[in-house]
């Protein structure tokens, strides 16, 4: 049946990790920080165990069980599982395109997971104006934290994200006009081993993900 349907004979020997290695090698069109995050998620949650599965043997029930394990045993939030799914689904799509699978076993699995689990969504609550003033007052009057005052004052006054604020250069600031040009973000790449051990980290600047991110405030 496999040969009749165009499935490669070597499919029985190819693991999910093998397909991920190929996917990572040929994938284009992602911001570097997004790509690095995908690599981290796969290596942290998929590669050690589920990644050793033979691609041709994967069934939808296997993917369901894997996601249930992430939710029930590892306690991951739905947002993290969603990100893992984004990577896994692309890898399995490539396996289908390359004739290692007939169909993608991860199709619609995440939707079913969301229905089956009662995930709690933590709503973010913005600081009130009074709370913002109290924070700035505390920072300015506490010697231990005074060095944090300028960046918090800028972020609260402009709405800049952390990466946007920490990536500012003097050439981005016009003191006479009282404006800031936002045209890049500072990104921290934190590389870890599968066991959580750090290998090192570095910083880099990237353009915003969307055109709307480039602005003057």
Predicted regions span which residues?
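C-terminal catalytic core of Y-nucleophile DNA break-rejoin enzymes
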Residues: 181, 190-200, 204-217
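N-terminal alpha-helical segment
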Residues: 16-19, 62-63, 147-148
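Basic, Lys/Arg- and aromatic-enriched nucleic-acid-binding interface segment
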Residues: 78, 82-86, 97, 101-103, ...
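Short, structural beta-strand-to-alpha-helix junction motif
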Residues: 14-19, 54, 169
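Secondary-structure transition/turn motif
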Residues: 68-72, 181-188
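N-terminal core-binding DNA-recognition domain of tyrosine site-specific recombinases/integrases
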Residues: 12, 24-105, 123, 143-144
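Short, surface-exposed polybasic/aromatic micro-patch for ligand or macromolecular engagement
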Residues: 1-13, 208-210
């Amino acid at each position: 049946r496999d040969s009749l349907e165009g499935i490669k004979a070597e499919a029985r020997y190819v693991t999910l990790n093998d397909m991920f290695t190929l996917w990572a090698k040929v994938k284009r069109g992602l911001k570097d920080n997004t790509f690095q995050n995908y690599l981290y998620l796969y290596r942290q949650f998929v590669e050690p165990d589920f990644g050793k599965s033979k691609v041709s043997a994967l069934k939808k029930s296997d993917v369901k069980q894997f996601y249930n394990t992430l939710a029930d045993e590892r306690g991951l939030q739905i947002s993290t599982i969603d990100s893992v799914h984004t990577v896994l689904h692309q890898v399995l799509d490539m396996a289908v395109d390359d004739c290692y699978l007939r169909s993608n076993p991860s199709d619609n699995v995440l939707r079913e997971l969301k229905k089956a689990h009662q995930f709690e969504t933590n709503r973010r609550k913005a600081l009130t104006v009074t709370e913002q003033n109290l924070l700035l007052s505390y920072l300015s009057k506490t010697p231990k934290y005074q060095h944090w005052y300028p960046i918090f004052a800028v972020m609260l006054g402009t709405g800049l994200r952390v990466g946007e604020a920490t990536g500012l250069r003097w050439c981005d600031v016009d003191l006479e006009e009282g404006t800031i040009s936002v045209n890049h973000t500072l990104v921290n790449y934190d590389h870890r081993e599968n066991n959580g051990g750090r290998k090192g980290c570095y910083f880099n600047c990237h353009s915003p993900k969307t055109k709307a991110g480039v602005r003057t405030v």
